Amino acid sequence: MAKVSMINKSQRTPKFKVRQHNRCPVCGRPKAFYRKFQMCRICLRKYASAGQIPGVIKSSW
């Protein structure tokens, strides 16, 4: 879980636009963020395996 202080700090608008960093809205994780799903890899895996993300299926080959 992300630190509450860092989550609050990231919600403020930065002085420069390039300083903005994507965070997972579920857990607040700043790294391993998937733009397509708007969440981190850990939450993506959890929700995909539970079947809560439409169109995502487990692949096998």
Swiss-Prot record:
Record GO cellular component, one term: cytoplasm
Pfam family, one: Ribosomal_S14
Keywords, in A-Z order: Metal-binding, Ribonucleoprotein, Ribosomal protein, RNA-binding, rRNA-binding, Zinc
InterPro entries on file: Ribosomal_uS14, Ribosomal_uS14_bact, Ribosomal_uS14_CS, Ribosomal_uS14_sf
Cofactor(s) needed for function: Zn(2+)
Keyword Ribonucleoprotein annotated: yes
Transmembrane region(s): none
Tagged with keyword Magnesium: no
GO molecular function: rRNA binding; structural constituent of ribosome; zinc ion binding
GO biological process: translation
Binding site for Zn(2+): 24, 27, 40, 43
Cofactor annotation comment: Binds 1 zinc ion per subunit.
Alphabetized Gene3D superfamilies for the sequence: 30s Ribosomal Protein S14, Chain N
Organism superkingdom: Bacteria
Quaternary structure annotation from Swiss-Prot or TrEMBL: Part of the 30S ribosomal subunit. Contacts proteins S3 and S10.
HAMAP family linked to this entry: Ribosomal_uS14_2_B
UniProt record similarity statement: Belongs to the universal ribosomal protein uS14 family. Zinc-binding uS14 subfamily.
Physiological role: Binds 16S rRNA, required for the assembly of 30S particles and may also be responsible for determining the conformation of the 16S rRNA at the A site.
Protein name: Small ribosomal subunit protein uS14
Organism, as annotated: Trichlorobacter lovleyi (strain ATCC BAA-1151 / DSM 17278 / SZ)
Lineage of the organism: Bacteria, Pseudomonadati, Thermodesulfobacteriota, Desulfuromonadia, Geobacterales
